Amino acid sequence: MERLTGRNVALLVLCLCAGYALVFAEGEKEIPVTKFGQNIAPTMTFLYCYSCGYRKAFEDYVGLLGEKYPQIQVNGGNYDPPGLNYYLSKMIFALKIIIIVSVVSAVSPFTFLGLNTPSWWSHMQANKIYACMMIFFLGNMLEAQLISSGAFEITLNDVPVWSKLQTGRFPSPEVLFQIIDNHLQFTEKVQENPDFVK
């Protein structure tokens, strides 16, 4: 078996990062499902900041809407932060994993760069568990700070009806019910024409 050298480990880490980037890029190219042939019912979508702890609020609204409007389909998901923050958080995640793997495998990235190994890196090598825990928690803190948007966005049939980012507050159930009633009042069901030739 070939001995693992620093160069081989670096190539392995590079391949893992490239694979992660390819998987990430493939996930964005999904084609949305069309609504043709489906029973079209009103659909309410909640996009919320998962790292802010708004999932519980989403579940409460789902329960309220299920009682009052059982015909409405309710979907929910994470609100991805706009702009550069999302990509920076992904880069911090990859960097965190690379550093932890380097510490655990006792590979010094400074030797690849032709630099002397700093004393703090040697200290990390001597205290691997402590160093890995600190890297993990600091990385998570930075990621959470970058992706926490404070969003709680509500759309009904792809029409925005409430934005916590704009109003600064959650809608009360009464306000949400009034918005839904007003929206459903204007949407009329398509009546089949008996004279239409099929």
UniProtKB/Swiss-Prot annotation:
One GO term of the biological process aspect: cell redox homeostasis
EC number: 1.8.1.9
Substrates-to-products reaction catalysed: [thioredoxin]-dithiol + NADP(+) = [thioredoxin]-disulfide + NADPH + H(+)
GO terms assigned for molecular function: thioredoxin-disulfide reductase (NADPH) activity
One Pfam family of this chain: Rdx
Disulfide bonds: 49-52
Coiled-coil intervals, chain numbering: none
One GO cellular component term noted in the UniProt record for this chain: endomembrane system
Swiss-Prot/TrEMBL keywords: Disulfide bond, NADP, Oxidoreductase, Redox-active center, Signal
Signal peptide stretch: 1-25
Function: Probably has thioredoxin reductase-like oxidoreductase activity.
Family per record: Belongs to the SelWTH family. SELT subfamily.
Protein name, entry field: Thioredoxin reductase-like selenoprotein T homolog CG3887
Source organism of this protein record: Drosophila melanogaster (Fruit fly)
Chain's gene name: SelT
